[in-house]
Protein backbone atom coordinates (compact mmCIF):
# COMPACT_ATOMS: atom_id res chain seq x y z
CA UNK A 1 0.00 0.00 0.00
CA UNK A 2 1.12 3.55 -0.64
CA UNK A 3 1.55 5.63 2.49
CA UNK A 4 0.36 9.18 3.12
CA UNK A 5 1.79 11.91 5.34
CA UNK A 6 5.30 13.16 6.02
CA UNK A 7 7.97 10.65 7.07
CA UNK A 8 11.76 10.37 7.10
CA UNK A 9 13.67 7.52 5.49
CA UNK A 10 17.42 6.94 5.86
CA UNK A 11 19.99 4.89 3.94
CA UNK A 12 23.76 4.58 4.28
CA UNK A 13 26.73 3.84 2.08
CA UNK A 14 30.41 3.20 2.75
CA UNK A 15 33.58 3.87 0.79
CA UNK A 16 35.79 1.22 -0.77
CA UNK A 17 38.20 1.70 2.15
CA UNK A 18 35.69 0.49 4.74
CA UNK A 19 37.01 -2.81 6.19
CA UNK A 20 34.00 -4.84 5.01
CA UNK A 21 34.32 -3.38 1.52
CA UNK A 22 38.03 -4.21 1.38
CA UNK A 23 36.93 -7.81 1.87
CA UNK A 24 34.24 -7.61 -0.80
CA UNK A 25 36.77 -6.16 -3.25
CA UNK A 26 39.33 -8.88 -2.53
CA UNK A 27 36.74 -11.66 -2.88
CA UNK A 28 35.40 -10.27 -6.16
CA UNK A 29 38.88 -9.60 -7.56
CA UNK A 30 39.77 -13.25 -6.97
CA UNK A 31 36.49 -14.27 -8.62
CA UNK A 32 37.21 -12.10 -11.67
CA UNK A 33 40.72 -13.49 -12.02
CA UNK A 34 39.38 -17.05 -12.08
CA UNK A 35 36.50 -16.28 -14.47
CA UNK A 36 38.96 -14.64 -16.87
CA UNK A 37 40.61 -18.01 -17.56
CA UNK A 38 37.74 -20.34 -16.65
CA UNK A 39 34.24 -18.91 -17.16
CA UNK A 40 32.72 -22.04 -15.61
CA UNK A 41 34.73 -21.76 -12.39
CA UNK A 42 32.79 -22.48 -9.22
CA UNK A 43 33.86 -19.90 -6.68
CA UNK A 44 32.86 -19.07 -3.12
CA UNK A 45 35.57 -16.92 -1.54
CA UNK A 46 35.32 -15.22 1.85
CA UNK A 47 37.80 -12.67 3.16
CA UNK A 48 38.56 -11.36 6.65
CA UNK A 49 40.81 -8.40 7.36
CA UNK A 50 42.14 -7.26 10.69
CA UNK A 51 45.20 -5.37 11.90
CA UNK A 52 48.02 -6.28 9.51
CA UNK A 53 46.36 -9.47 8.29
CA UNK A 54 44.20 -10.75 5.42
CA UNK A 55 42.64 -14.21 5.61
CA UNK A 56 41.09 -15.72 2.46
CA UNK A 57 39.05 -18.92 2.71
CA UNK A 58 36.40 -20.74 0.73
CA UNK A 59 35.69 -23.31 -1.92
CA UNK A 60 36.88 -23.16 -5.53
CA UNK A 61 36.68 -25.69 -8.34
CA UNK A 62 38.42 -24.47 -11.48
CA UNK A 63 41.02 -25.13 -14.15
CA UNK A 64 42.35 -21.58 -13.75
CA UNK A 65 45.19 -20.32 -11.59
CA UNK A 66 45.08 -17.12 -9.57
CA UNK A 67 47.96 -15.63 -7.60
CA UNK A 68 45.80 -14.88 -4.58
CA UNK A 69 48.43 -13.14 -2.40
CA UNK A 70 49.26 -10.79 -5.28
CA UNK A 71 45.57 -10.09 -5.96
CA UNK A 72 45.08 -9.31 -2.27
CA UNK A 73 48.01 -6.88 -2.14
CA UNK A 74 47.13 -5.18 -5.43
CA UNK A 75 43.53 -4.70 -4.30
CA UNK A 76 44.49 -3.24 -0.95
CA UNK A 77 46.99 -0.86 -2.56
CA UNK A 78 44.51 0.23 -5.24
CA UNK A 79 42.02 1.15 -2.53
CA UNK A 80 44.69 3.35 -0.98
CA UNK A 81 46.09 1.48 2.01
CA UNK A 82 49.82 1.82 1.46
CA UNK A 83 51.02 2.80 4.92
CA UNK A 84 50.49 1.59 8.47
CA UNK A 85 49.74 5.23 9.31
CA UNK A 86 46.52 4.80 7.31
CA UNK A 87 45.58 1.67 9.23
CA UNK A 88 46.82 -0.90 6.71
CA UNK A 89 49.61 -1.49 4.19
CA UNK A 90 49.16 -3.76 1.19
CA UNK A 91 52.92 -4.02 0.78
CA UNK A 92 53.57 -5.61 4.15
CA UNK A 93 50.31 -7.13 5.43
CA UNK A 94 50.21 -10.85 6.09
CA UNK A 95 48.13 -12.95 3.68
CA UNK A 96 46.79 -16.36 4.68
CA UNK A 97 44.97 -18.53 2.12
CA UNK A 98 42.80 -21.56 2.93
CA UNK A 99 40.90 -22.62 -0.20
CA UNK A 100 39.34 -26.04 -0.79
CA UNK A 101 37.19 -27.58 -3.53
CA UNK A 102 33.43 -27.19 -3.88
CA UNK A 103 31.47 -29.95 -2.16
CA UNK A 104 30.71 -32.70 -4.69
CA UNK A 105 27.22 -33.00 -3.21
CA UNK A 106 26.52 -29.34 -4.03
CA UNK A 107 28.18 -29.69 -7.44
CA UNK A 108 25.96 -32.61 -8.45
CA UNK A 109 22.82 -30.54 -7.89
CA UNK A 110 24.15 -27.68 -10.00
CA UNK A 111 25.57 -29.84 -12.79
CA UNK A 112 22.65 -32.30 -12.89
CA UNK A 113 19.45 -30.64 -11.80
CA UNK A 114 16.56 -32.24 -9.95
CA UNK A 115 14.73 -32.22 -13.27
CA UNK A 116 17.49 -34.38 -14.81
CA UNK A 117 17.62 -36.81 -11.93
CA UNK A 118 13.85 -37.31 -11.72
CA UNK A 119 13.19 -37.57 -15.43
CA UNK A 120 11.37 -34.23 -15.64
CA UNK A 121 13.94 -32.85 -18.09
CA UNK A 122 12.64 -31.30 -21.27
CA UNK A 123 14.70 -30.90 -24.43
CA UNK A 124 15.85 -27.53 -23.09
CA UNK A 125 19.49 -27.62 -22.00
CA UNK A 126 18.79 -24.83 -19.51
CA UNK A 127 16.89 -27.38 -17.41
CA UNK A 128 20.16 -29.21 -16.74
CA UNK A 129 21.55 -26.55 -14.38
CA UNK A 130 20.05 -26.52 -10.91
CA UNK A 131 20.13 -23.70 -8.38
CA UNK A 132 23.33 -23.62 -6.33
CA UNK A 133 21.36 -23.27 -3.10
CA UNK A 134 17.89 -22.81 -1.74
CA UNK A 135 16.89 -19.25 -0.98
CA UNK A 136 14.81 -16.20 -1.73
CA UNK A 137 15.92 -13.10 -3.59
CA UNK A 138 14.29 -9.70 -4.03
CA UNK A 139 14.43 -7.04 -6.72
CA UNK A 140 13.14 -3.49 -6.44
CA UNK A 141 12.64 -0.39 -8.56
CA UNK A 142 10.96 2.96 -8.01
CA UNK A 143 10.45 6.22 -9.88
CA UNK A 144 12.39 8.16 -7.19
CA UNK A 145 15.36 8.69 -9.53
CA UNK A 146 16.11 8.45 -13.28
CA UNK A 147 17.97 5.18 -12.61
CA UNK A 148 14.82 3.88 -10.85
CA UNK A 149 16.44 3.55 -7.44
CA UNK A 150 15.36 4.83 -4.01
CA UNK A 151 16.71 8.35 -3.56
CA UNK A 152 18.29 7.86 -0.09
CA UNK A 153 20.64 5.06 -1.17
CA UNK A 154 21.32 6.70 -4.54
CA UNK A 155 22.50 9.90 -2.85
CA UNK A 156 24.44 8.04 -0.16
CA UNK A 157 26.37 6.13 -2.85
CA UNK A 158 27.09 9.32 -4.79
CA UNK A 159 28.48 10.92 -1.65
CA UNK A 160 30.69 7.91 -0.92
CA UNK A 161 32.00 7.82 -4.47
CA UNK A 162 32.73 11.54 -4.36
CA UNK A 163 34.49 11.13 -1.01
CA UNK A 164 36.81 8.63 -2.64
CA UNK A 165 37.27 10.76 -5.76
CA UNK A 166 38.46 13.84 -3.85
CA UNK A 167 40.87 11.67 -1.87
CA UNK A 168 42.37 9.82 -4.82
CA UNK A 169 42.56 12.90 -7.06
CA UNK A 170 44.36 14.92 -4.39
CA UNK A 171 41.61 17.55 -4.07
CA UNK A 172 41.50 16.73 -0.34
CA UNK A 173 44.86 15.01 0.18
CA UNK A 174 44.46 14.69 3.94
CA UNK A 175 41.57 12.21 3.61
CA UNK A 176 42.18 8.51 4.20
CA UNK A 177 40.35 5.52 2.63
CA UNK A 178 37.85 4.58 5.36
CA UNK A 179 34.53 6.42 5.30
CA UNK A 180 30.75 6.26 5.54
CA UNK A 181 27.84 8.39 4.40
CA UNK A 182 24.20 8.51 5.45
CA UNK A 183 21.24 10.33 3.89
CA UNK A 184 17.83 11.10 5.41
CA UNK A 185 15.08 12.08 2.98
CA UNK A 186 11.67 13.48 3.89
CA UNK A 187 8.85 11.83 1.96
CA UNK A 188 5.34 13.18 1.51
CA UNK A 189 3.49 9.96 0.91
CA UNK A 190 5.67 8.17 -1.63
CA UNK A 191 7.26 11.34 -3.05
CA UNK A 192 10.71 12.52 -1.95
CA UNK A 193 10.35 16.22 -1.11
CA UNK A 194 13.30 17.30 1.06
CA UNK A 195 16.87 16.39 1.88
CA UNK A 196 16.84 16.53 5.66
CA UNK A 197 20.18 15.22 7.01
CA UNK A 198 23.53 14.13 5.59
CA UNK A 199 26.14 12.38 7.73
CA UNK A 200 29.70 12.04 6.45
CA UNK A 201 32.26 10.20 8.54
CA UNK A 202 35.70 10.04 6.99
CA UNK A 203 39.11 8.93 8.10
CA UNK A 204 41.67 11.72 7.92
CA UNK A 205 45.27 12.57 8.71
CA UNK A 206 46.19 13.61 12.24
CA UNK A 207 45.95 17.26 13.29
CA UNK A 208 43.11 18.14 10.89
CA UNK A 209 40.74 20.81 12.21
CA UNK A 210 37.22 19.37 12.11
CA UNK A 211 35.31 22.65 12.23
CA UNK A 212 37.53 24.96 10.22
CA UNK A 213 38.90 22.63 7.54
CA UNK A 214 37.20 19.23 7.24
CA UNK A 215 33.57 20.32 7.53
CA UNK A 216 33.80 23.28 5.10
CA UNK A 217 35.77 21.16 2.62
CA UNK A 218 33.25 18.32 2.69
CA UNK A 219 30.33 20.72 2.43
CA UNK A 220 31.80 22.27 -0.73
CA UNK A 221 33.81 19.50 -2.41
CA UNK A 222 31.62 16.50 -1.59
CA UNK A 223 28.05 17.49 -0.70
CA UNK A 224 28.00 20.57 -2.93
CA UNK A 225 29.45 18.67 -5.86
CA UNK A 226 26.89 15.86 -5.57
CA UNK A 227 23.94 18.25 -5.23
CA UNK A 228 25.10 20.12 -8.34
CA UNK A 229 24.92 16.88 -10.34
CA UNK A 230 21.39 15.78 -9.46
CA UNK A 231 18.49 16.98 -11.59
CA UNK A 232 15.62 17.02 -9.11
CA UNK A 233 14.25 20.58 -8.94
CA UNK A 234 11.32 19.40 -6.83
CA UNK A 235 13.66 18.26 -4.02
CA UNK A 236 14.14 20.90 -1.31
CA UNK A 237 17.85 21.17 -0.46
CA UNK A 238 17.68 24.60 1.16
CA UNK A 239 18.16 23.59 4.78
CA UNK A 240 20.31 20.47 5.01
CA UNK A 241 21.71 19.40 8.35
CA UNK A 242 25.29 18.24 7.66
CA UNK A 243 27.00 16.18 10.35
CA UNK A 244 30.71 15.57 9.80
CA UNK A 245 32.55 13.02 11.96
CA UNK A 246 30.03 13.36 14.82
CA UNK A 247 32.36 11.47 17.21
CA UNK A 248 35.20 13.94 16.61
CA UNK A 249 38.50 12.86 15.08
CA UNK A 250 38.71 9.77 12.86
CA UNK A 251 42.40 8.99 12.44
CA UNK A 252 42.43 5.31 13.40
CA UNK A 253 40.56 3.60 10.56
CA UNK A 254 40.62 0.70 8.16
CA UNK A 255 41.30 -2.80 9.47
CA UNK A 256 43.27 -1.32 12.38
CA UNK A 257 40.07 0.29 13.62
CA UNK A 258 37.63 -2.53 12.83
CA UNK A 259 37.88 -6.04 11.45
CA UNK A 260 36.15 -6.56 8.12
CA UNK A 261 34.32 -9.48 6.52
CA UNK A 262 32.97 -10.29 3.07
CA UNK A 263 29.21 -9.95 2.75
CA UNK A 264 28.54 -7.76 5.75
CA UNK A 265 27.10 -4.77 3.87
CA UNK A 266 24.18 -6.41 2.07
CA UNK A 267 21.79 -3.48 2.59
CA UNK A 268 24.37 -1.01 1.29
CA UNK A 269 24.83 -3.34 -1.70
CA UNK A 270 21.13 -3.34 -2.58
CA UNK A 271 18.37 -0.80 -1.84
CA UNK A 272 19.37 0.87 1.41
CA UNK A 273 16.63 -0.85 3.40
CA UNK A 274 13.73 0.37 1.27
CA UNK A 275 13.15 -3.15 -0.06
CA UNK A 276 13.27 -6.52 1.61
CA UNK A 277 16.38 -8.70 1.39
CA UNK A 278 16.66 -12.46 1.16
CA UNK A 279 19.83 -12.46 3.28
CA UNK A 280 22.36 -13.73 0.77
CA UNK A 281 25.50 -11.72 0.08
CA UNK A 282 27.00 -11.24 -3.40
CA UNK A 283 30.76 -10.80 -3.35
CA UNK A 284 33.07 -13.74 -3.95
CA UNK A 285 30.32 -15.89 -5.51
CA UNK A 286 30.20 -17.06 -9.11
CA UNK A 287 26.83 -16.76 -10.90
CA UNK A 288 25.83 -20.39 -10.30
CA UNK A 289 25.03 -19.08 -6.81
CA UNK A 290 21.48 -17.72 -7.05
CA UNK A 291 22.17 -15.47 -4.06
CA UNK A 292 23.96 -13.33 -6.61
CA UNK A 293 22.62 -14.11 -10.07
CA UNK A 294 18.93 -14.26 -9.11
CA UNK A 295 19.16 -11.02 -7.11
CA UNK A 296 20.61 -9.40 -10.22
CA UNK A 297 17.83 -10.91 -12.32
CA UNK A 298 15.15 -9.61 -9.98
CA UNK A 299 16.55 -6.08 -10.21
CA UNK A 300 16.40 -6.52 -14.00
CA UNK A 301 12.77 -7.64 -13.74
CA UNK A 302 11.76 -4.84 -11.35
CA UNK A 303 13.51 -2.11 -13.33
CA UNK A 304 11.90 -3.24 -16.58
CA UNK A 305 8.48 -3.38 -14.92
CA UNK A 306 8.75 0.23 -13.72
CA UNK A 307 10.29 1.37 -17.02
CA UNK A 308 7.35 -0.28 -18.79
CA UNK A 309 4.91 1.76 -16.72
CA UNK A 310 3.36 -1.24 -14.98
CA UNK A 311 3.84 0.39 -11.57
CA UNK A 312 5.65 3.34 -10.00
CA UNK A 313 7.17 1.12 -7.34
CA UNK A 314 7.59 -2.62 -7.44
CA UNK A 315 9.24 -5.38 -5.44
CA UNK A 316 9.60 -8.90 -6.82
CA UNK A 317 10.65 -12.06 -5.01
CA UNK A 318 11.84 -15.32 -6.49
CA UNK A 319 12.65 -18.51 -4.56
CA UNK A 320 14.62 -21.65 -5.39
CA UNK A 321 15.25 -25.16 -4.08
CA UNK A 322 18.85 -26.35 -4.22
CA UNK A 323 19.50 -28.44 -7.29
CA UNK A 324 16.21 -27.55 -9.00
CA UNK A 325 16.19 -25.43 -12.15
CA UNK A 326 12.68 -23.99 -12.05
CA UNK A 327 11.93 -21.42 -9.33
CA UNK A 328 9.57 -22.65 -6.62
CA UNK A 329 7.90 -19.27 -6.23
CA UNK A 330 7.42 -15.76 -7.64
CA UNK A 331 5.80 -12.89 -5.72
CA UNK A 332 5.04 -9.35 -6.88
CA UNK A 333 4.26 -6.33 -4.64
CA UNK A 334 3.30 -2.99 -6.20
CA UNK A 335 2.45 -0.99 -3.05
CA UNK A 336 -0.76 0.32 -4.57
CA UNK A 337 1.09 2.00 -7.46
CA UNK A 338 0.12 -0.52 -10.16
CA UNK A 339 -1.33 0.65 -13.48
CA UNK A 340 -3.03 -2.68 -14.16
CA UNK A 341 -4.09 -5.76 -12.20
CA UNK A 342 -1.11 -7.06 -10.12
CA UNK A 343 -1.98 -10.62 -11.15
CA UNK A 344 -1.60 -9.54 -14.76
CA UNK A 345 1.79 -7.98 -13.95
CA UNK A 346 2.96 -11.23 -12.37
CA UNK A 347 1.78 -13.24 -15.39
CA UNK A 348 3.54 -10.81 -17.74
CA UNK A 349 6.78 -11.22 -15.79
CA UNK A 350 6.47 -15.01 -15.99
CA UNK A 351 5.93 -14.82 -19.76
CA UNK A 352 8.75 -12.33 -20.38
CA UNK A 353 11.57 -13.56 -18.13
CA UNK A 354 13.07 -17.04 -17.82
CA UNK A 355 14.21 -17.23 -14.19
CA UNK A 356 15.95 -20.60 -14.29
CA UNK A 357 19.59 -20.14 -13.17
CA UNK A 358 21.02 -21.21 -16.52
CA UNK A 359 18.75 -18.79 -18.37
CA UNK A 360 19.68 -15.91 -16.08
CA UNK A 361 23.37 -16.59 -16.66
CA UNK A 362 22.77 -16.77 -20.43
CA UNK A 363 20.52 -13.73 -20.75
CA UNK A 364 22.65 -11.45 -18.56
CA UNK A 365 25.96 -12.86 -19.86
CA UNK A 366 27.24 -13.43 -16.34
CA UNK A 367 30.20 -15.76 -17.01
CA UNK A 368 32.52 -12.76 -17.33
CA UNK A 369 34.94 -10.95 -14.99
CA UNK A 370 32.58 -8.03 -14.24
CA UNK A 371 32.23 -8.34 -10.49
CA UNK A 372 35.10 -6.44 -8.83
CA UNK A 373 33.62 -3.16 -10.10
CA UNK A 374 30.44 -3.88 -8.11
CA UNK A 375 32.21 -4.47 -4.79
CA UNK A 376 31.72 -0.88 -3.59
CA UNK A 377 29.05 1.80 -4.16
CA UNK A 378 26.21 -0.63 -4.79
CA UNK A 379 25.28 -3.34 -7.26
CA UNK A 380 22.16 -1.57 -8.53
CA UNK A 381 21.33 1.77 -10.12
CA UNK A 382 24.94 2.42 -11.07
CA UNK A 383 25.38 5.36 -13.42
CA UNK A 384 29.19 5.14 -13.52
CA UNK A 385 29.55 1.61 -14.93
CA UNK A 386 27.62 -0.54 -17.42
CA UNK A 387 25.91 -3.54 -15.81
CA UNK A 388 23.67 -5.94 -17.78
CA UNK A 389 20.94 -6.17 -15.14
CA UNK A 390 20.42 -2.41 -15.39
CA UNK A 391 19.25 -2.74 -19.00
CA UNK A 392 15.58 -2.02 -19.74
CA UNK A 393 15.65 -4.17 -22.88
CA UNK A 394 12.51 -6.11 -21.93
CA UNK A 395 10.32 -3.12 -21.03
CA UNK A 396 8.32 -2.99 -24.28
CA UNK A 397 7.81 -6.74 -24.36
CA UNK A 398 6.72 -6.68 -20.71
CA UNK A 399 4.31 -3.83 -21.34
CA UNK A 400 2.74 -5.68 -24.25
CA UNK A 401 2.43 -8.86 -22.20
CA UNK A 402 0.59 -6.89 -19.52
CA UNK A 403 -1.82 -5.52 -22.12
CA UNK A 404 -0.77 -1.87 -21.82
From Swiss-Prot:
Catalytic activity field: L-methionine + ATP + H2O = S-adenosyl-L-methionine + phosphate + diphosphate
Class of the enzyme per the UniProt entry, highest EC level: transferase
Subcellular location as annotated: Cytoplasm
GO terms for MF: ATP binding; magnesium ion binding; methionine adenosyltransferase activity
Binding of Mg(2+), residues: 20
Self-association and partners: Homotetramer; dimer of dimers.
EC number: 2.5.1.6
A Pfam family annotated for this UniProt entry: S-AdoMet_synt_N
SUPFAM superfamilies from the UniProt entry: S-adenosylmethionine synthetase (SSF55973)
Designated name of the protein: S-adenosylmethionine synthase
Binding site for ATP: 18, 178-180, 249-250, 258, 264-265, 281, 285
Pathway(s) of this molecule: Amino-acid biosynthesis; S-adenosyl-L-methionine biosynthesis; S-adenosyl-L-methionine from L-methionine: step 1/1
Cofactor-binding details, from the entry: Binds 2 divalent ions per subunit. Binds 1 potassium ion per subunit.
Principal subcellular localization: cytoplasm
Residues that coordinate or bind L-methionine: 59, 102, 258, 289
Chain residue ranges for the region called Flexible loop: 102-112
Task of the protein: Catalyzes the formation of S-adenosylmethionine (AdoMet) from methionine and ATP. The overall synthetic reaction is composed of two sequential steps, AdoMet formation and the subsequent tripolyphosphate hydrolysis which occurs prior to release of AdoMet from the enzyme.
Cofactor requirement: Mg(2+); K(+)
Family membership: Belongs to the AdoMet synthase family.
Keywords: ATP-binding, Cytoplasm, Magnesium, Metal-binding, Nucleotide-binding, One-carbon metabolism, Potassium, Transferase
Binding site residues for K(+): 46
NCBIfam families the record matches: metK
Domain of life: Bacteria
Any single Gene Ontology cellular-component annotation: cytoplasm
Amino acid sequence: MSQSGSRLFTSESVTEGHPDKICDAISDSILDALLTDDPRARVAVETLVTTGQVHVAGEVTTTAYADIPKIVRDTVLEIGYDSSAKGFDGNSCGVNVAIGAQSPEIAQGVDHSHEVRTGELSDDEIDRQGAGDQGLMFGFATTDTPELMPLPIALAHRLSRRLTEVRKSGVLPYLRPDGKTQVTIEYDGDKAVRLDTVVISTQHAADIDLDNLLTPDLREKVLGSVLAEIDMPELDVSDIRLLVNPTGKFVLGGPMGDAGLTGRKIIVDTYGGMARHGGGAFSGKDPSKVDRSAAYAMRWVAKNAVAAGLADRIEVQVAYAIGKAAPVGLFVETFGTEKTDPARIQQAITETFDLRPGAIIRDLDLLRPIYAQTAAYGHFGRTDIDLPWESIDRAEKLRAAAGL
